[in-house]
Amino acid sequence: MKKIIIAIVLLSATYTKTNACSWSSEDGSFYNLFNQQLISDKSLLPFFLTYDETFYSANGLNDDATATQEIDYNILEWKKYFNNQLNEQELHYFVYQSSVADLSKISTSKSLKGINDTLKKQIYLTDKGIEAINYLLFAKKCEPFATSSEESDDENWYYGSIRKKMTKPEFMSTAKDGNLLYAATKDTDIKLRIAYQLVRLSHYGGFNDDAIRYFSTYVVPLKQKTLLYYYALEQKAGALFNQKKFAEAGNAFAEVFHNTTDRKIPCYASFRISNQMSFDKAILLCKTPNEKAALYVLRGFNKFSNGLSEMKNIYAVAPNSAYLELMACRALLQMEHTAFQIPNQYNDKNTFPLMNVAGKTYLQKAILFTQTLLKENKTKRIDFWQTYLAHLYLLNGEYAKAQATAQKINSTDKDIIAQKDKTEFCAYIGSLKTIDAAAEQKIYQRYLNQKEASNETGFVYEILGHNYILQNNLAKAFLCHNNFSGLYGSLNIAIINDLIDFVGKKNKSDFEQKLISDKIASDNALAELYDLKGTHYFKKDDLENALIWYKKVAENLAFLKQRSYDYDKDAYIETDGIFNGYSNISAGIFSSKVQTYFDNTVEQAFSDNTYTSFDFIRKSLNKQQLVEAMIQLKKMAAGKDEQAAKANFLLGNFYYNTSHWGYYRNFFYYEPGNYYLSYLYGYNTTPNTIKKTYNYNEGAGLITSNNPQKAYDFFIKAESISSNNELKAKSVFQASKCELDLFFSKGDNDYFGYGDDYKLLYSTSTRPMFKRLKDNYSQTAYYKEIQSNCNYFKYYLQFRL
């Protein structure tokens, strides 16, 4: 358990503010700059590379993707069958929703009376219509055995639907009906549909020999390689797989994969060839180069496959295949995933782009392959492959070659043109050694005057952010990745000073104005920076310097809101927290109570009203007024009278309340609330240091320290000066809280490090203030309040350790 706490403390040193239960995206962990949608066959979209999902979706997974609507290819086949006389909505009802009763009425009476209005179409009374209806009646009879429609009734932990189990007599009876219908049907399209139902029925019923026989005797003789042919072939492939004829099954799945759009994913999911011998046999069974290419691409999707090797295999048999383009894009994105990883800002060995030795070797082989492909001139889409090569050069850090190759591309494809421009400009950015005004203007003209940021813009900011750090332009480096909230954890004075100069600069360039407006939403940017600088000094207890900067801030400045997710409304909502960033701070920050909880309201959290003895402490303060009050309290605390004792007590309360275990622990970290701040949990009594950063893409870090000794000293001084036993009792009890924090801060005594010896938490050795409280102040009213509300003290009195 002790190691867990140590890990938390170490993690806090590289803190970045995130939602506690936020979803982490691997697709979002790198800059994807190459558009996979450049491939010629868009039906392959599900097989674009994605790390977050099993299959790629254009609906929101990729900035370059356009939303696609699912097409029902079966309905399109029905539309052709009825010579486009019925629309897709009418056909959808006819095929999927019509009742057996209505269809039977039409078939037997040859009339449309007494049926659903949607079915009242004269075309259903034609010979084609009647044969279609008779087929649907048979299909609906087969449906329970072929689709998942029944709830599982076994005792396993499975709650999904299952297919109805089929007995041999049920199969024989249903197949006989299909045989008779097949023989009686004249239209070959409907005969093919009946044959498909019989192949599927046999396959799902476990009668694999019958499935293969039906395909050979009912499907093949029709000589119709339409969609239903491939639907039937897929069922035959499943039967072959069940018979452990893996090569034959793989070959059939590859043929269906190549010739259909809607069955690509199921065929990929069903494709199982685990050894080279079976794969070689499947290749020999292929009738066309494209079928061979489909086999290679199906194998290439597996994680164990080498994408470049499969590219070479596909190129050898079908150099113009879209599968080659697909495998090339997948391989390139894998290389981007390695090279363009968003850097860890605290990694001393970081470089960007980043490529390990194995990745570099693979990239150079890909470059050589693409150069050879272009030289041999076997492919028609020269513009695609030139664009691809230019991007490989970009990945390899050969920026001049990337720009030169991109400039040679001549294309009428707007997507190719957009990609080559993107690659060329990213190469230009990568080649920059310093960022000057001319470079900034060029960047502004290309990106920053656009309304929506792209992944490319993120890449550009990555390069800029690091170069700006090297140029010691900290403000611009910081704003490449952050708004002011990136400073809340560290209050980095160097960045704050540079930001004050930058934001206050006159005659800003277009680039500089855009950088500020994109990252800083505030209308009072300078005021917020002055507040940050003041708080930097306040956190160091340098009150005089803090006051200088707070005097530049409007007294009612407020910029923090509590942000939470409303699951009912599916939206984030903002509410007021206990701290708005600058103003409306309760005088309770100087107060105390025996037992305070983080989820208390301010009114619930504190009960002591000693602070009301000081007229200069307002009920509600801003930071300037708070610092002014503390300066006065510190002056008074140097005295020897009762007011001096009270001043020491209030100062102790302030330092305790703003410590990591106090109600206002959020105060110096700009959190609107004090709840769920696990990143603050730390026992270090001196501030941690932050390593030299590669960039600021995770903010400026987190600097924490917990100093209960300061509060303790003020409480002890208050007790020593005061002549009021009630105030003495309060001071001693508050000091006992500090004792516990000090106990935890010593080496092996962190929260889980005291060996689960809970008695240490209330023993005299750990809490000597408990003994002082018992010995000296047991007659006070506050002592009785402590007895009633503090369990630690109750245990101390009980065990007298």
Locate each region found by the language model.
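Sec-dependent N-terminal signal peptides
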Residues: 4-13
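Extracytoplasmic/secretory-pathway proteins
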Residues: 20-200, 205-801
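Bacterial Sec-dependent signal peptides at the C-terminal "C-region" and cleavage site
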Residues: 13-21
